[in-house]
Amino acid sequence: MVGDCQITFQLVESHSATSELESQVAASDLVIEVLHDWQEKLSLSDLCMASRKPLLHCGGAGMRFQLFCMLPGKSCCLRCLLASLGLEDSIGSREAQGVLESLAGIIGNSLALGAVKILSGFGASQSNELIKIDGLSGELEVLRGFDPVSDCPDCGVVRGKLL
C-alpha cells in the first residue's frame, strides 16, 4: 500500500495570465484539468507537455465523460488525442447539458485515484488510454494506443527529447 505522504493542492478557478499559469505548472508535480472551454484545455495541455508535467484530463457533460492521463514522452498530447477521435465523438458543453452529480463523483474519484498512482508510483498509470464513461447506457470503454505523434510539435518533440 501507499505509505504516508504529503500532498498540497492549488486550485486555479480561472484561466490565469500566461506567465502566471506557466509558473504554476512549472511548480506542480501534476495538473488535473476539468476546464469547460476546449481552447483553455488545449492551451493547458500544450503548457504541460512543454514543461513535461503529467496532465489528468476530464471532459464531459450530462451523463457522458472521458478521462485521459497525458504523460509527456509516453502518450500523445490532448490536441492529438482529440484529433484522433474526430468531431463526431466529441462531448458537448457542460453549460448546455449540465452534469449528473452522482456521475461527477465517480469521475472525481477516478481522477483522485489517477493522481495518487502518478504521484506515488503505485500501480499502473492509464497513460495512452482514454476511458469513456456513459452513465446512460452504463457502458465503460477503454481505448488504447494514444502514443506520442512523431510529427506533432508538442508530444512528438517531447518524446524526441526524452529518447
Segments from the language model and where they lie:
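Adenine nucleotide-associated cytosolic modules
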Residues: 1-163
